[in-house]
């Protein structure tokens, strides 16, 4: 599913134990793209040694309920490993979808990456 295409996710370590995964897609509405993004996120998570991850969605303008379901599956994948996830940078349509789905009841949804890192950072 990844043959010949660049990854939709880049990773950087932030304040030690928190890894920030940045999504490089502005329109997460096509089934193929959602599937590829899910694969790329799992690969980045499995390759990392962090116990907390921030998903930076600041570049995402549109997403579907299928994409929302994929993010929830990523959250469950991390929880099974004893890891935590926060979403950051959602604005406009994406923020509305998260609010309507009451996603903040399941995991932290923060306006900025910095706030998400602060929430997940070990004391």
What do these predicted regions represent?
Residues 2, 10-12, 77, 99:
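Short secondary-structure boundary/capping segments
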Residues 4-39:
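STAS-typified acidic loop motif
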Residues 27-107:
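Amphipathic alpha-helical interaction surfaces in cytosolic regulatory modules
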Residues 108-116:
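Short acidic-hydrophobic, aromatic-tinged amphipathic segments that line or gate anion-handling sites
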Residues 1-5, 123:
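Intrinsically disordered or compositionally simple regulatory linkers and C-terminal tails
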């Amino acid at each position: 599913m990844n043959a010949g295409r660049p990854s939709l996710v880049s990773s950087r370590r932030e304040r030690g134990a928190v890894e920030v995964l940045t999504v490089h897609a502005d329109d997460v509405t096509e089934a193929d793209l959602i599937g590829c993004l899910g694969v790329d996120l799992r690969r980045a998570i499995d390759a990392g040694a962090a116990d907390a991850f921030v998903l930076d969605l600041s570049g995402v303008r549109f997403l579907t309920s299928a994409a929302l379901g994929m993010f929830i599956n990523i959250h469950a994948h991390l929880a099974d490993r004893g890891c935590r996830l926060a979403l950051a940078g959602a604005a406009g349509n994406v923020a509305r979808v998260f609010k309507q789905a009451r996603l903040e009841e399941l995991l932290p949804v923060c306006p900025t990456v910095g706030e998400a890192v602060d929430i997940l950072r070990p004391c």
